[in-house]
Amino acid sequence: MFFVLGAALGMWLVPLSTVLDAHGLHAIKPFAFAANGLAAFVSPLIFGALADRRASPVKVLRALSVANAAAMALATTSIQGRWNPWIVLGLIQLHALCSSPAFSIASTIVFARLADAKMEFGPIRAMATLGWMAGCWLVSALNADQSALAGYSGAVTWLVVCAFTFFLVVLPTPKSNKRLAWHERLGLDALTLLKNPDHRVVFLTSALFTIPLTAFYPYTPVHLRELGLAHTSAWMSLGQITEIVAMFGLGALLVKWRLKWICACGLGLGVLRFALSAVNGKAWLLAGVVLHGCSYTLVYITAQIYLDQRVAAAWRARGQALFSLMTSGLGNLIGYLGTGAWFATCARPLGTHWPLFWSGLAAAVAVVLVYFLIAYHGRGKRFLTAGSTDDSSASSGDPPNAIQPIQ
């Protein structure tokens, strides 16, 4: 399931930049990518609360898969038909609302079936990355890097995701007799998790790191093409190779290293990744693409495992949903609009000033690294915990309020 889900997501996001350019929709590109950010402010928390309290995550993902297939097909048709840009953006936003909760719901499904998430989640999550790569390669094999065919293929892939959900055992959903307030129905009570200082640092670091990272898919393909590298979707998938390697090795790292140093290493690789791209050469840019995957894993996947280990079972779908809001929502929205403005600032009459563009992003990641090293306390510290794993009230769905050491 993770494999096919990754393919469906990759077949839309990776070629989107070049597909919009090929159909004369370059002007809406920053807003098209920002649609994911807007959607992540709304749908992940709502569907996360639904999966925690009302419906099985498997059934939620099944419905989302069908909705994604329909929305992606409509959005692709509007791009191909060169409809009014506002209509195109509206349909892209509709698709974003359907796709934003999918990965956090899928992660919740997987975590619920693992005996040892630290050791097992990385390799299983790698299947999504393999699917992402396969989706990119299929797009390039179909010569659809700039074609609407990429979107139609992705829509069909979402239907395959739906089919896979019928092979999953539906686990019982934790029940609560408490009458839910409107903010609980919308999943806004997940914000309680931010009361824990270490939780807050992990959420904020992930969100801040997302801001410069959003430049990867809109602008790296453009730089690759300017350097004479065609089949950009396939070249971009190089980053997933190191992502997979890192995922298979992450379990061993979590046993030997503190979370603080794993995340710090990922952030440091993020600085190096953008610094290499700033050299403005084929080999250097490709080296930066390769490092992207390793950096991504050490920050984001570690954060997801942290949440599964430190958040009570009745809150885990909302915890993963809040992670989606902070990264896909807050981080992506600020990132796509901010890097779009930064890209325009770096534009010159003879072309983009790529060294300046990538160097600015490297500096931004360096600031995030410094913040994390200073603010995260970790092992040996005791803080007020929202939804901690030993919180009996949280396990019943009531507001959590416990003290627990955070590693």
Regions flagged by a language model, labelled:
Residues 3-4, 71, 84-104, 109, ...:
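Hydrophobic core of transmembrane alpha-helices in multi-pass small-molecule transporters
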Residues 1-39, 198-237:
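Helix-loop boundary and gating motifs at the non-cytosolic
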Residues 16, 99-115, 298-312:
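Intracellular juxtamembrane helix-capping segments at the cytosolic ends
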